[in-house]
Curated annotation (Swiss-Prot):
Coiled-coil ranges per UniProt: none
Residues that hold ATP according to the record: G15, P16, A17, A18, S19, G20, K21, G22, T23
EC number per UniProt: 2.7.4.25
Lineage: Bacteria, Pseudomonadati, Pseudomonadota, Alphaproteobacteria, Hyphomicrobiales
CDD domains named in the record: CMPK
The protein's name: Cytidylate kinase
Subcellular compartments: Cytoplasm
Keyword Kinase: yes
Catalytic activity, as annotated: CMP + ATP = CDP + ADP; dCMP + ATP = dCDP + ADP
Pfam family, one: Cytidylate_kin
GO biological process: pyrimidine nucleotide metabolic process
Gene Ontology MF annotations: ATP binding; CMP kinase activity; dCMP kinase activity
Amino acid sequence: MKSFVVAPFIVAIDGPAASGKGTLARRIATHYGMPHLDTGLTYRAVAKALLDKGLPLDDEALATDAALSLDLLAMDKAVLSAHAIGEAASKVAVMPAVRRALVEAQRHFANALPSSVLDGRDIGTVVCPDAAIKLFVTASPEVRARRRFDEVLARGDTADFAEILADLKKRDERDMNRTDSPLRPAEDAHLLDTSEMSIEAAFLAAKKLIDHALAQHRG
């Protein structure tokens, strides 16, 4: 009698900053009862570890040490969402050794579970290239900047829309043109433009694709 191992069912969600991929990933994870990992938080956690110790952000060896000792289950999204940490994270994220260490941790998270939802910039292309379903979530820079602007105001902080828009465009440029794991859709990813979509509409579009992939996965 043959025995076989069923591959984990991984939902890979990629996209630029403020595209809505995180909100969608959390909604999907809740609906299907799947563990969720926001891989962007892993880079923020490394940056915060360096900032907390007053260490330089451009030291790849120190940043890699922080990445290797990171506890994925101890990350606090509320704490890591600070703008300064996001800026610092974009600097450590371009370091190849840091990316390798975090990709390995992210991949282990996905492969150790029967099913999971991961969102980030390179899930479908690098972290989980064999994911059962890949979504690339995007929206126009102006729509994404408006979402980020509204988020900041909702927290009771002040924000400048033009500054947020310029920052997003700069981050897009950096993400798409870095030599290691540039931001791009996987060849087999489903493109989901949420520019004119509500959260519910985006979820229903994703759910239809995931339900089909689940049916195929279960044979």
